[in-house]
Amino acid sequence: MAANYWVSTQRRHWLFTRERLADIREGFKERDKVAHSQFPLPDQRLLNIYFSQQLIKLGKRTTTRQQALATAQVYIKRFYTKNDIRHTNPYLVITTAFYLACKMEECPQHIRFVVAEARSFWPEFIAPDVSKLGECEFALISEMNSQLIVHHPYRTLSELTPELQLTSDEVALAWSVINDHYLTDLPLLYPPHVIAVMAIIVAVVFKPSQTSFHGSAGPALAGAMRDGGVNLLAALGDKNGNGPPRIQKLVGWLAESEVDIKAVIECTQELVSLYEIWEQYSEKHCKELLGRMVKSKNLDK
């Protein structure tokens, strides 16, 4: 596998500007105004939360590694930069992305087992015929131009842990923040090292009183990031050595590094927006809207 992100297809072909992503999505809407009017869907971030929860269900019995689930989430995002979700069966796309990601992350699952697992959760949307998943896999690979290697922020977090002397609690929280960033557009907007640095800063600056984190950091961090603690922008802008030594050390490291601080701040703001809209999330609502869309358009056939 390509170890160097800087020469990767991810950097060359799968990083977008916010404007480009908005144009792509607006283009889908313009090309099929009727479908967009007939089948309204929740905010993309709420859909991402729903998709993530479905992937976790798929991976639970096989104890699939988090990195494979993260790769699957990136595949889904990439696929939907080329295809309007209203013309697809999202449950088949989720299942196929999971199957393909497991192969790429060297924890493969048998196709029949994956289909059986998916049918145990969504029998009305997944056909028993494994060839359907095979066809969708071909489409997924084709839409991504066979560019299947994904570089994740977890590696940078591991590399920076000893250098920044992060505590186990800080590492756990940063890991959870990285998990959460897959629920946003950030994997399509910024390099993985920027995401990792953002997660570390959030873990150190906004560290809540909880001592353990599992999966998502959202509930624990939402209030801290929105309402108080240390203001991140002030912390990053403080060149006078004020504030807690722990944070000043991090600010000093950032100043000496070549990390784009503006990008880190933008990533943090995106995370705050995610945690704010998370309060509106309803699994039932997402399931109902997607189910009506798939059934009405016969996308489950």
From Swiss-Prot:
Q: Which GO terms describe its cellular component?
A: nucleus
Give this protein's Gene Ontology molecular function annotations.
cyclin-dependent protein serine/threonine kinase regulator activity
Has keyword Nucleus?
Answer: yes
Record localization: Nucleus
Chain ranges of the Cyclin N-terminal domain: 53-142
Entry's transmembrane regions:
none
Top-rank taxon, per record: Eukaryota
UniProt keywords, alphabetically: Activator, Cyclin, Nucleus, Repressor, Transcription, Transcription regulation
Q: Name one GO biological process term.
A: regulation of transcription by RNA polymerase II
- InterPro entries (alphabetical): Cyclin-like_dom, Cyclin-like_sf, Cyclin/Ssn8, Cyclin_N
Main localisation, per the record? nucleus
Task: Name the job this protein performs.
Answer: Component of the srb8-11 complex. The srb8-11 complex is a regulatory module of the Mediator complex which is itself involved in regulation of basal and activated RNA polymerase II-dependent transcription. The srb8-11 complex may be involved in the transcriptional repression of a subset of genes regulated by Mediator. It may inhibit the association of the Mediator complex with RNA polymerase II to form the holoenzyme complex. The srb8-11 complex phosphorylates the C-terminal domain (CTD) of the largest subunit of RNA polymerase II.
Assembly, per entry: Component of the srb8-11 complex, a regulatory module of the Mediator complex.
Family to which this protein belongs = Belongs to the cyclin family. Cyclin C subfamily.
Name the chain's protein.
RNA polymerase II holoenzyme cyclin-like subunit
Q: Which organism is it from?
A: Aspergillus terreus (strain NIH 2624 / FGSC A1156)
Source gene? ssn8
